[in-house]
Amino acid sequence: MLIDAYGRRISSLRISLTNRCNLKCIYCHNEGEEDSGSEITVEEVAQIARICARYGVDKIKFSGGEPLLRRDFDEILRALPPMRDVSVTTNGTLLAARAESLKESGLDRVNVSLDSMDRDRFTFITQCKGQFDKVLDGIDAALSVGLTPVKINMVYLKGINEDEVDRMIDYVRGKPLVLQIIELMNFHGAFKYHADVASLEQRIKEKADKAVCREMHRRTKYYLGGAEVEIVRPIDNSEFCMNCNRLRITSDYKLKPCLLKNDNLVSVRGLSDAEVEAVLIKTVGAREPFFKSETAKVCQPYKIYEP
């Protein structure tokens, strides 16, 4: 296992496969990445997954950009070592045609971005015409082949889709779908669309039949008459950092210890397995919460438990 100096065990990888996207969403921050022009290869994904698996990492999420733009995504999935959970976050526009093959290649589930059930609003948000029905078809395809639960990511946007929450809840009700209502983060001036989710969460809480708190994010899942709903707040808090168990890999094959920082990326491109392993151990050892207090630190060196 890999455990950093703050007692956080790394059990999950988040791998960005590309910076490219076929939509132009008005709020997109591309996970803080800059275009490098050199995408991570199948062999590189397999290498980092194989090495991390030796240390107890058993969960991988792929993201982008739009990861389904990678024509070799099926090959990437087949190159992975056994994992407890393999998922992808996608805009869904290319999912219908690929859902079955992705499932057969080892994908377990999908997150699909769907910010509006209104066609015109969807077009405004994505800045692309003719994509709305493709996303709905993609969700249906994911359900039909068992890429479940399908998580529906709805970014809550001021003056745009605030009135659609009930409609979205109705959409997921009674299906293996989970609605994630996401509070907008402040990236690249998009904060003009920010809408506070506090009052919304209180309203959902009052209607809920049951509420369950998830450990990592201290995020509550609400159950409302056959619908599952989560409120996802910006991760600018020490509680999220305290429970972070993820190591991120950029689309140009760099280790990214913290989602909110880009000044400590570590390239492992062109290295042997032994060299990558050594860099991985060192990177985890230097890993720190972005939001922290001095009293939060565990007074011991990082721990490496040999596989």
Swiss-Prot record:
Enzymatic reactions: GTP + AH2 + S-adenosyl-L-methionine = (8S)-3',8-cyclo-7,8-dihydroguanosine 5'-triphosphate + 5'-deoxyadenosine + L-methionine + A + H(+)
One Pfam family in the UniProt entry: Mob_synth_C
GO biological process: Mo-molybdopterin cofactor biosynthetic process
EC number per UniProt: 4.1.99.22
Xref: SMART domains: Elp3
Coiled coil: none
Binding site for [4Fe-4S] cluster 2: 241, 244, 258
Domain Radical SAM core: 5-227
UniProt-annotated binding residues for GTP: 14, 61, 89, 151, 246-248
Record pathway: Cofactor biosynthesis; molybdopterin biosynthesis
Cofactor note: Binds 2 [4Fe-4S] clusters. Binds 1 [4Fe-4S] cluster coordinated with 3 cysteines and an exchangeable S-adenosyl-L-methionine and 1 [4Fe-4S] cluster coordinated with 3 cysteines and the GTP-derived substrate.
Keyword set, alphabetical order: 4Fe-4S, GTP-binding, Iron, Iron-sulfur, Lyase, Metal-binding, Molybdenum cofactor biosynthesis, Nucleotide-binding, S-adenosyl-L-methionine
GO molecular function, one term: cyclic pyranopterin monophosphate synthase activity
Domain of life assignment: Archaea
UniProt binding sites for S-adenosyl-L-methionine: 27, 65, 113
Enzyme class: lyase
Record NCBIfam families: moaA_archaeal, PRK00164.2-1
PANTHER family: MOLYBDENUM COFACTOR BIOSYNTHESIS PROTEIN 1, MOLYBDOPTERIN COFACTOR SYNTHESIS PROTEIN A
Homology family: Belongs to the radical SAM superfamily. MoaA family.
Protein's recorded name: Probable GTP 3',8-cyclase
